[in-house]
Amino acid sequence: MLNSRDQGNLHSGLCLWLCGFLALFKGSTGCESEEQLFHRLFAHYNRFIRPVENVSDPVTVHFELAITQLANVDEVNQIMETNLWLRHIWKDYRLRWDPTEYDGIETLRVPADNIWKPDIVLYNNAVGDFQVEGKTKALLKYDGVITWTPPAIFKSSCPMDITFFPFDHQNCSLKFGSWTYDKAEIDLLIIGSKVDMNDFWENSEWEIVDASGYKHDIKYNCCEEIYTDITYSFYIRRLPMFYTINLIIPCLFISFLTVLVFYLPSDCGEKVTLCISVLLSLTVFLLVITETIPSTSLVIPLVGEYLLFTMIFVTLSIVVTVFVLNIHYRTPATHTMPKWVKTIFLQAFPSILMMRKPLDKTKEAGGVKDPKSHTKRPAKVKFTHRGESKLLKECHHCQKSSDIAPGKRRSSQQPARWVAENSEHSSDVEDVIESVQFIAENMKSHNETNEVEDDWKYMAMVVDRVFLWVFIIVCVFGTVGLFLQPLLGNTGKS
């Protein structure tokens, strides 16, 4: 005999077993219902026939594009690679059923290869298959509405204009349409006016500014029929941060280093060395970034124009530096400074640039007279009898007025008397006088040579200062002008 506790446990176990059996029976019934429905729908189904009751009726296909990733933009080959979901919605009257007859089944997932599908292809495909593979399943509803959303990776052709690289915008389009059915057989309708970007992964180099879709009815030269297509235009903008940091800013620094060449004095001897160093650094930099710049012969990219501008800039600085050094080391023996050069470079430009000769500043600070007054041609000394007697009188006068002792005065009068008596016949005195005149002439010539050399050096300083400002202006305005082009170009397009 079972007690009441054992009877309760047995009753509970029987209930659980019965519930599990009923659930299993119901599940097997559901699977059987789905299998029966599948066999009933596709027993006599022909996937090659359009799903229309009347041959003259078109199949209305609703089409929508969803983008998940902008994988790559190849500027050289002009290809845009995208990861897309293509949503097709149409109605097939042959695939209807009553849910009440099949245990309430309202949806059925069927292989896409088992049903009729619109042959929607990408017209401007560049690489790979033009048509989407039918490996995914389609969602079939009891009223005959079919939703098929296959994923696809397309490499579409996209004519690109890289004139303003790396500040460029591109307009790439994806053109979808039926390849064999015309408008009378398939009518494409676009779902919404924008590309679905809810599941889009941001790209590190490109930003999608706008993605709009448009429907077109086109008559091609090959055929009499009108074909419908849906074209999505992707307006994308390049993110220039990478190129700005690694390309443009180093070029700017190199350009401004070139300007500093004209601030170096010519005497230091490092002007040409600095120019060559800057040119070599720019050349090495160009070799490094060659693979980064799009290689095309259709247009010159903006960054290519800037690199060319920088190269010309550095080359001109070397030419100007050589010219300045040539001026700096000129002498009266090799060159004569024309008057117009003196007027322009020694008077006009210094006043405009507020430059003054260092010698002039020294004279103002120390109150020194013009050195030219000290280098005037001395009067030729002529030792005539009249001059000699005058000189001797002055010497006797000095001797009389002095406080020298009489013994010493008597001894000092003897050389003077000897000079007076033997001046006419002394050849040594004449040699001394000629030597003094020779020294005076050499000093005068040396001073004049120094003045001319100082003028050439000062002219070199003026030319350096002129080109310093010229190169600063050209560098600033050239850089601003080049990089304002994308802004002005986009404003004009808008």
From Swiss-Prot:
Disulfide bonds join C158-C172, C222-C223. The keyword Membrane applies. Neuronal AChR is composed of two different types of subunits: alpha and non-alpha (beta). CHRNA6/alpha-6 subunit can be combined to CHRNB2/beta-2 and CHRNA4/alpha-4 to give rise to functional receptors. Interacts with LYPD6. Residues 328-465 are cytoplasmic. Residues 399-423 are annotated as: Disordered. This is Neuronal acetylcholine receptor subunit alpha-6. It is a multi-pass membrane protein. Keywords: Cell membrane, Disulfide bond, Glycoprotein, Ion channel, Ion transport, Ligand-gated ion channel, Membrane, Phosphoprotein, Receptor, Signal, Synapse, Transmembrane, Transmembrane helix, Transport. InterPro entries: Neur_chan_lig-bd, Neur_chan_lig-bd_sf, Neur_channel, Neuro-gated_channel_TM_sf, Neuro_actylchol_rec, Neurotrans-gated_channel_TM, Neurotransmitter_ion_chnl_CS, Nicotinic_acetylcholine_rcpt. Activated by a myriad of ligands such as acetylcholine, cytisine and nicotine. CHRNA6 nAChR activity is inhibited by the antagonists alpha-conotoxin MII and PIA, a small disulfide-constrained peptides from cone snails. Predominantly expressed in only a few brain areas, including dopaminergic neurons, norepirephrine neurons and cells of the visual system. It catalyses: K(+)(in) = K(+)(out); Na(+)(in) = Na(+)(out); Ca(2+)(in) = Ca(2+)(out). The chain crosses the membrane at residues 241-265, 272-290, 306-327, 466-485. GO terms for cellular component: acetylcholine-gated channel complex; cation channel complex; dopaminergic synapse; neurotransmitter receptor complex; postsynaptic membrane; presynaptic membrane. The keyword Zinc-finger does not apply. GO terms for biological process: behavioral response to nicotine; membrane depolarization; presynaptic modulation of chemical synaptic transmission; regulation of dopamine secretion.
